[in-house]
Amino acid sequence: MSCSARLKTNLGMTSALSTHEVLNSNDTMCEILILLPPETIYKLILVSKRWLEIIASPCFRHTYLAKWKPNFELIGFFVCSSMYLGRRIDGTRRPRAEPSLPLLSTSSIGDEIESSGILKKLGYYIDSADGLLLCGRHPKAYYLWDPSTQKQQQLPRPRVHFEELCMSLISEDSPDQGFSYKVVRAECVAFPVNSTKVKVETFSSKTSTWSYSELICLEPLSLSPWTPGRVIKGVVYWHARGGKIAIYDSNSEEKRIDVIKLPKTYDYDEQVLGETDDGSLQYGWSNKSVMEVWKLEKVGNVLEWNLLFKVNFKAMWKMNQAVATRFSTWTKETQLLALFNQKSDLVYIRCDTQIFIYHTETKRVEVVQYQGRKSTLVWDFNKVVPYFRRTWPCSPLFENNAMMIDTPQCNASSAGSN
């Protein structure tokens, strides 16, 4: 189906279509629907099955999202612990009473996911992309879970063993083929001897197989294990030792990995990566007194870090005395928690067990209400990452003939959309 073609008469002139003809022409309906704002589009999927098929089609979705920025709904926050990953010298194992995949729910969808019991089957959190969730138990079992269909798929077992690694999930959206995904595993070597190679194994949903490759770097490189990276338009950003960021373009035929120094190289308490609204990499850090957020931009042919904003926590709470008094933030440490998805003017911060949103333009702080076992979490030893879902109707990612395992059903696909 072409989203731009117009119905024409035999003389090549656009015809005066009747209402009935317009409603029964997919091409004409596409041209009308693409002019409507997202909040209207989300309601129109309920009109008929045919309208849902048009709106959920890869062609229309790709064209529409090129015109209108996609909205993302916060489902909740996953609590990620690296204490039990890899081979532990001290033999530490997760206690039975401690969940492997805790979710601090902020939405009705998150509540249903938590109550469905599916999180108990997926292992540990690894990464997410547009709501698609990557979890597993290193180094053998990895699962993908789609919130739109409540289905999960187990990936084939990787062919290469990495003692320590970092992983990323890459979602792809083609106007012709629709959604697909890739999973990238990269080896992390603790003590490299001037190694300029990084071993990588990639799974593609298009081929349903793992492929092995070695990436070349122009300087010695050692990736940081078990740390969440960031994927922007197929480019993977991973933390590397020595205050660096490794950059790997998964779409490039060149088997290389680049490196850029972070704007600050000290050992800060918190370091997070994110994406700006124009598709650039964001880097944020915080210590006990301040936080900074930087943007990676290309100036000519050189990548440079530019400071977006710097916030003094003491001054911030002074401007938000009502919130500070309510949650007694004066006597507790404040930290940068995470960056918003494709936004530069909002960040998540944490003070004790409370999560807040800081608005950089208005300098205001608002509390984030969530459900979860906040009192039992060891916050200082866990990474808390936001879990977003793109609020857009889509066709199932996993086909019926894909490898599935039983999933408790919940009504997540129809609850709480923006």
UniProtKB/Swiss-Prot annotation:
Residues 18-66 form the F-box domain. InterPro entries: At3g26010-like_b-prop, F-box-assoc_interact_dom, F-box-like_dom_sf, SCF_F-box_component. Pfam families: b-prop_At3g26010-like. It comes from the Eukaryota. PANTHER family: BNACNNG10540D PROTEIN, F-BOX DOMAIN-CONTAINING PROTEIN. This is F-box protein At5g03970.
